[in-house]
Curated annotation (Swiss-Prot):
Function, as annotated: Functions as a dosage-dependent inducer in mitotic control. Tyrosine protein phosphatase required for progression of the cell cycle. When phosphorylated, highly effective in activating G2 cells into prophase. Directly dephosphorylates CDK1 and activates its kinase activity.
Record-given protein name: M-phase inducer phosphatase 3
Region (Disordered) residue spans: 1-20
Subcellular location: Nucleus
PROSITE patterns hit by this protein: RHODANESE_3 (PS50206)
Keyword Transmembrane on entry: no
Assembly and oligomerization: Interacts with MAPK14 and 14-3-3 proteins. When phosphorylated on Ser-126 and/or Thr-127, interacts with PLK1. Interacts with MARK3/C-TAK1.
Residues carrying Phosphothreonine: T64, T127
Post-translation changes: Phosphorylated by PLK4. Phosphorylated by PLK1, leading to activate the phosphatase activity. Phosphorylation by PLK3 at Ser-219 promotes nuclear translocation. Ser-226 is a minor phosphorylation site. Phosphorylation by CDK1 occurs at G2 and G2-M transition and leads to increased activity.
Gene designation: CDC25C
Active site: C322
Family recorded in the similarity comment: Belongs to the MPI phosphatase family.
Length: 420
């Protein structure tokens, strides 16, 4: 049955328009594919990245065979599905094909790559694209964990992050270089830290448990060495070591030789100063000794009118003693030296040679009783002189307080501080 010219023309138009429709559909599909594979500012991607990309998750999910839809027959209203060819290996372009339950292995040009060798030595900065890329990886990993029942367990090796090449390479001597250990050389952070010597750990710790004797020595050293005089002139009398390192000690034998005139060719005059209290001095003292128990009397005796030797080749020496030559004798000796130093310009002194009788009168009396007058020995704590002992001690403390106050006032005046 003839339908006229119009039906035939319609068939011709449909036959002509069908290829053009398929061509337009393919063109749109190619545009979509080109859009997905267009160049971006992201870092170069590795096969591991493409495996973790969200666009490939559909291939990894489930065990159902995948079909490829043919869109060429859309004009006829038919769609054909063809099975997708799967493979467990990567092709040359780095794309991944699914092979169902087969094991997935990462290979690159037929050789294994050390994951630590590909990590950059130092990364100076990060870009927003790298951060976005890392976020996409995190989403992909969460998607894999959510669908872990349908994924092969051998895919756990894909959690390793592929090496990246930083956009900015560090230069030698760059101040912004990271101090992290060189992972590319296989050096661990612990080894790097241990190789750096710390000055804090190298310092030995001080002992907290000091003996009482050591503490006393430490507290006394500044006072002793501050009063020490480094005289280049040799001493006339032979000296020995004593309790105070800054003072010069002589033995009772030397004092006895001095009294016998053994050193007349070197010494013009000598003075033996007995620093004990008057009741001790009256109980027995060395022949020719002068009793001076206060610093004021000592200064007036020797410094009010200094004793100068007539022969410049000879010297004037002073020997101090008390009962044990432990406290009072050394204190008086230091007082005279301090005052003498203040009245002269260093290193000049009126009395450069001051000595201490080691052991005091207690050691001298038993050995040289004939050189004592009277020939007796009255100790400081004698039962018959307790009241006198208390009186002289109070007087000595008062004089010491006045001396310290006068020294502080003189020091303030020297610094220019006005007193009220």
């Amino acid at each position: 049955m003839s339908t006229g010219p119009f039906p035939s023309s319609r068939r011709e138009e449909s036959s002509v328009s069908a290829p053009s429709f398929r061509f337009s559909q393919r063109k749109m599909l190619n545009l979509l594919l080109e859009r997905n594979t267009s160049f971006t500012q992201d870092f170069p991607r590795s096969p591991g990245d493409k495996l973790l990309d969200s666009t490939n998750l559909s291939i990894l999910s489930g065990g159902t065979p995948k079909r490829c839809l043919d869109l060429s027959n859309l004009s006829n209203g038919e769609m054909s599905a063809s099975p997708l060819i799967t493979s467990a290996d990567f092709d040359d372009t780095g794309s991944l094909d699914s092979s169902g339950p087969q094991d997935v292995q990462l290979t690159e040009k037929n050789h294994h790559q050390d994951p630590m060798k590909g990590i950059p030595v130092q990364l100076l900065c990060s870009t927003p694209n790298a951060l976005d890329h890392s976020h996409r990886k995190k989403d992909a990993v969460r998607g894999l964990s959510a669908n872990k029942e349908n994924i092969n367990t051998n895919l756990k090796t894909l959690q390793w992050e592929s090496p990246r090449i930083p956009r900015f390479q560090n230069t030698p001597g760059d101040p912004l270089a990271s101090p992290l250990p060189l992972l590319g050389n296989g050096v661990s952070m612990d080894t790097e830290v241990r190789s750096l010597g710390s000055p804090i750990t190298a310092v030995p710790k001080l002992s907290k448990n000091l003996n009482l004797e050591d503490q006393e020595e430490i507290s006394e050293e500044p006072m002793e060495f501050s009063l020490e005089d480094h005289d280049t002139k040799e001493c006339v009398l032979p000296t020995v070591s004593g309790k105070h390192q800054d003072l010069k000690y002589i033995t009772p034998d030397t004092v006895a030789a001095l009294l016998s005139g053994k050193f007349q060719g070197l010494i013009e005059k000598f003075y033996i100063i007995d620093c004990r209290y008057p009741y001790e001095y009256l109980g027995g003292h060395i022949l020719g000794a002068i009793n001076l128990c206060s610093q004021k009397e000592l200064h007036e005796f020797f410094l009010k009118k200094p004793i100068v030797p007539l022969d410049i080749q000879k010297r004037v020496i002073i020997v101090f003693l008390c009962e044990f030559s432990s406290e009072r004798g050394p204190r008086m000796c230091r007082s005279l030296r301090r005052k003498d130093r203040a009245l002269n310009q260093y290193p000049a002194l009126y009395y450069p040679e001051l000595y201490i009788l080691k052991g005091g009168y207690r050691d001298f009396f038993p050995e040289y009783t004939e050189l004592c007058e009277p020939q007796g020995y009255c100790p400081m704590h004698h039962q018959d002189h307790q009241a006198e002992l208390l009186m002289w001690r109070n007087q000595s403390k008062a004089q010491e307080g006045e001396r310290q106050l006068s020294e502080q006032i003189a020091l303030l005046m020297k610094k220019g501080v006005s007193l009220p």
